[in-house]
Amino acid sequence: ELSHQTNSLPEVCGRVCPQDRLCEGSCTLNDDFGAVTIGNIEKYITDKAFEMGWKPDMSHVEWTDKKVAIIGAGPAGLAAADILVRNGVKAVVFDRYPEIGGLLTFGIPSFKLEKGIMENRRRIFSEMGVEFQMNTEVGKDVQLQQLVDDYDAVFLGVGTYKNMRAGLDNEDAPGVYDALPFLISNTYKVMDLESPTPFINMQGKKVVVLGGGDTAMDCVRTSIRQHAANVVCAYRRDEANMPGSRREVKNAREEGVKFKFNLQPIGLELNSAGHVVGVKFVKTALGEPDEAGRRRPEPVEGSEHVLEADAVIMAFGFQPHAMEWLEPFGVELDQWGRIKAPGQQEFQYQTTNSKIFAGGDAVRGSDLVVTAIDEGRKAAEGILDYLEV
């Protein structure tokens, strides 16, 4: 009960959050004795509670006649639904995928977050009164206008799904893949679901993954499990400046992934058939800090070389995808395509359309699971205030 007071998905955060650079990194015992393993504790407590039959106590809830449509069954949408139903507001969640979780289910591999975790959470949320409309894409299977008309409020928890690119020539060549389609296709295979796209198989291939975050680690470790012949992760800064979890880097190394640091991709090499056969790199040295305080990677003259590869995965992160179906409703976006929904206002995370709220990656940009959960919960509180519940 205590862990659920501030977190709608503690069993997930205990598994996927980079605790080493968050809570455990700030632990006062870290220097001398090693940090308290907060993630493992969070995971154990929640798993044990589920094993013992725990479920949220909804006996005190007085149901109102209010109902809210939630677009997106990822961490922000699920967190919003959790808070709403606990306060007697009907929550109906719409999502284009066949299972809940969004990227928790389809983007994070099963070796890091077991698929049964979200299946169990769907059962719990359903018993709490959350209704799920899966395989339902807004703008295609149901129109936003219908949701705005039929519900007292709408929450947008649609995440960020557009892959960032490096701006290299030949990025669309055969053998070059974006991280998310690769990970999603693998999940459909693992879950034995009918995939809308072909399975991307790295078996027997020389794989180079570009990027240094947790998504890159998911890609290299998935490639290993698909029996790639060789897997290399190339990152433009040094190891100390990698944004990903230290634990994930350690796991990848132990599984056979090779790391090459201070390498910046400058081109893709193709054979006569147009298929990728290598990545051209230039070595880098770290220069002056950028606006975020991280030292800039600067190219070293005369250090160009080619690394052989017949599969290249781009794992540079995600940015907001186009949402044309929002345009007629006066929902403003910022210059990066993120939904404007400030947390500090009368109704938290309300957009420029008073009936529509938003939170998570669609508002702040690609970030951690725990921040999406937090914003989903706070947006739900804003909705409750708006509905005067």
Feature names for model-found ranges:
Residues E1-S3, D31-G39, I70-V138, M164-E171, ...:
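Beta1-alpha1 glycine-rich phosphate/pyrophosphate-binding loop at the start
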Residues E1-V16, F33-E62, T187:
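Ferredoxin-type iron-sulfur electron-transfer modules in oxidoreductases and energy-metabolism complexes
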Residues I45-E62, R123-K140, N163-Q226, Q335-F347, ...:
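Glycine-rich dinucleotide-binding loop and its adjacent helix/turn
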Residues E62-I71, E119-L168, G267-K280, A285-E288, ...:
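Feature captures the FAD/FMN-dependent oxidoreductase FAD-binding
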Residues I71-P75, G211-G213, D361:
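Glycine-rich Rossmann-fold phosphate-binding loop(s) that bind the pyrophosphate
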Residues D172-G204, P289-S366:
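FAD-site-proximal beta/loop scaffold in flavoenzymes
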Residues I200-R237, P299-V300, H305-A311, G317-F318, ...:
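Long hydrophobic segments that form regular secondary structure
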Residues C219, A362-E388:
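A conserved FAD-binding loop/helix module that cradles the flavin
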